[in-house]
């Protein structure tokens, strides 16, 4: 589901998997434990339920104070245009050059890949920027955090998450991710913004926490 809700048709399948002794990991907004059938089955068969979007960390509000180290954020013209892929590709290339670098996951799939991180769209809005400050704290002057972007500043549904992520990331640099063949934003009746518009808006909004923010590249998703 586009909004992260658990489809009813999945419940029986999940219960069946539990009966076979499988632990269950879910990236949905709907918590596995909120479904009685799933919760009871997990207890009966002694398996673990992992809700990847949730954790027990109490985040503070963002403070916008300058942190040591360098940060790069991937931003997008829309959802699902390659922000995670780009971030991972950049991290890999920098590691091959023996640079100090870490991928910082902000979505459930990224958390699965990195085995750590935060699903930022499940954080209460007041604490989004603070959660990202926690995720990317002070570091060595020559260390880069490559932060996975979410949504788009131009998406009517998810721009709030994107903006909080931008402010908390305090990026020195950003890469714009874009799918050239896409004409309409995912899930809404809205035209795609131009790459130029995204660069301009990201710089304008990003200056709140880093006056030196700048675009260093464009990543094109040519899979479609």
Regions found by a protein language model. Give the residues of each.
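Extreme N-terminal, non-catalytic leader segments
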Residues: 3-4, 10-71
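Short glycine/serine/threonine-rich phosphate/pyrophosphate-binding segments
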Residues: 5-10, 80-88, 112, 153-158
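Non-transmembrane, aqueous-exposed alpha-helical and coiled segments at domain scale
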Residues: 12-18, 71, 103, 109, ...
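Flexible, glycine/proline-enriched loop segments at strand-loop-helix junctions
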Residues: 23-29, 73-81, 118-122
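Conserved catalytic-core segment of NTP-binding enzymes
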Residues: 26, 30-32, 40, 49-59, ...
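Short acidic, glycine/serine/threonine-rich loops at helix termini
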Residues: 37-38, 61-64, 85-87, 113-117, ...
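Walker A (P-loop) phosphate-binding motif
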Residues: 59-97, 101
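N-terminal phosphate/diphosphate-binding loop that engages ATP/GTP or pyrophosphate donors
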Residues: 71, 91-126
